[in-house]
Amino acid sequence: MSVGFVGISDGWQDLSQNFKLTWDYTRAENGNIAMTGEIDLAACEGEFVIALGFGGIWSEAGQQVRATLLDSYDELHKHYVGQWETWHEGLMKLDSIPRERDLYRASVAVLRTHESKDFLGGVIASLSIPWGFNKGDEDLGGYHLVWPRDLVETAFGFLAAGAETDAVRVLRYLESTQEADGHWAQNMWLDGRPYWMGLQMDEAAFPILLVDCLRRNCPSTLGNLKRWWNLVRRAAGFLVCNGPVTQQDRWEEDAGYSPFTLAVEPVVAVPGAGMILPGNGSPVLGSTITTGILTPAAFFLVT
């Protein structure tokens, strides 16, 4: 087994040059690394177990691996599969057609797989890095970041499949990552630290849509609506004070009046906030949102 830097001293470089593994580097730090090993399939009769551990230091990772290997593989497998089966049993039965069953179940499983185990409700956009083979060590973000827009759309997917608790969990995550002025970062690490620093107004509007959608479709799972009024109040206030123009649209990141942003921002999210806020602690802002600032043209008309 050997560990090395990708493109320099990794196992592929060894194999392509020597046609067998000849390197045995035991350490590689501060870079994009790859580990390569060789297993004697004859000696193990074709069966082997690989345990992979992570930690801040080598001893922590080693302890994780050792603890796992001491457990029964069959019991761990049964527990893991059982958790997935239990979750799927709670979803809507949309798989009556055998040909489409796997597509539905696989799709919702992909959504659930992208949720963090440490930051519940935090669902990254993708476990991939686009054009990964051409990326260097400095391209850390990729798509394994949280985009508030994609996160809300994932919550809509959960809700459509009947995973109401999962959708509400997403809202709780958004509640904890909202900026003081009411908006959300363009994208962020799971712990809420902003990555790209752009401002996309639709991403300040989408969480309001999620609150309203949950309010209408699963009020008992959402719980007391008053809990969310502060999130809605701040987001709606940000939209009213800064919209409808956006610093960036969702794809090309151009500034101006984006049709997509306009569709989400004043047409849907702001009236939705107007229905949520009155009677939930902010009648003045609720009135402002439903009637416009000074005149309806100040916010709702683009010429």
Regions found by a protein language model. Give the residues of each.
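Hydrophobic side chains in beta-strands
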Residues: 52-54, 209, 298
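Short, well-ordered loop/turn and helix-capping segments at boundaries between secondary-structure elements
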Residues: 54-55, 160, 216, 302
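Aromatic-rich carbohydrate-recognition surfaces in CAZymes
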Residues: 80, 141-243, 262-269
